Regions:
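Hydrophobic anchor at the start of a short beta-strand
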Residues: 18-20, 38, 68-70
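Active-site-adjacent loop/helix micro-motif of nuclease/hydrolase catalytic cores
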Residues: 44-58
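Conserved catalytic cores of phosphodiester-cleaving nucleases, focusing on short active-site segments
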Residues: 31-46
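Acidic-basic catalytic patches of nuclease active cores, encompassing PD-(D/E)XK
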Residues: 1-25, 79
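Acidic, low-complexity, intrinsically disordered interaction modules
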Residues: 45, 79, 87-103
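Charged phosphate-binding loop/patch that engages nucleotide di/tri-phosphates or the phosphate backbone
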Residues: 100-125
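Nucleic-acid nuclease catalytic cores
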Residues: 64-87
């Protein structure tokens, strides 16, 4: 399966995980089950290192409570996933990058964003 849009990833995850559902539209994460919350990113390019915006990471870790917290990155025909609770904060490299303010709109303003570089040895395929 080729993952071109977030909806492609959602459809696939619903197929392989029994009790997973879409989260509410304005939620800080994309999907949830009784056991976990999931944030999804679809990338158009491959990177040697994947990142998560610090704001997003902090929000997810606060909201997940006792649930699992997963970050799923889709690129082409592969899904990479990170168990964020399995990554010690000391393993995260902080980087400040110029990025679009949001990814939802074209011609978006470029702003500086703090992002964590996720450790490759914690990546699951």
């Amino acid at each position: 399966m080729i993952f071109k849009k977030e909806s492609d990833v959602r459809e696939y995850l619903k197929f392989i995980i029994n009790d997973i559902e879409d989260s509410e539209e304005m939620s800080h994460y994309d999907m949830e089950s009784i056991r976990s919350i999931i944030e999804i990113k679809v990338r158009k390019s491959y990177y040697d290192k994947w990142m998560i915006e610090k704001y997003k990471y902090d929000k997810l870790m606060k909201l997940c409570g006792s649930k699992g917290c997963y970050y799923v990155v889709a690129y082409d025909h592969k899904l990479y996933w990170y168990d964020l609770k399995d990554i010690d904060i000391s393993e995260l490299e902080l980087s400040i990058m110029d990025c679009p303010k949001t990814t939802d709109f074209k011609n978006n303003k470029i702003v500086k964003k703090e992002s964590y570089i996720l450790p490759n040895h914690k990546k699951n395929i």
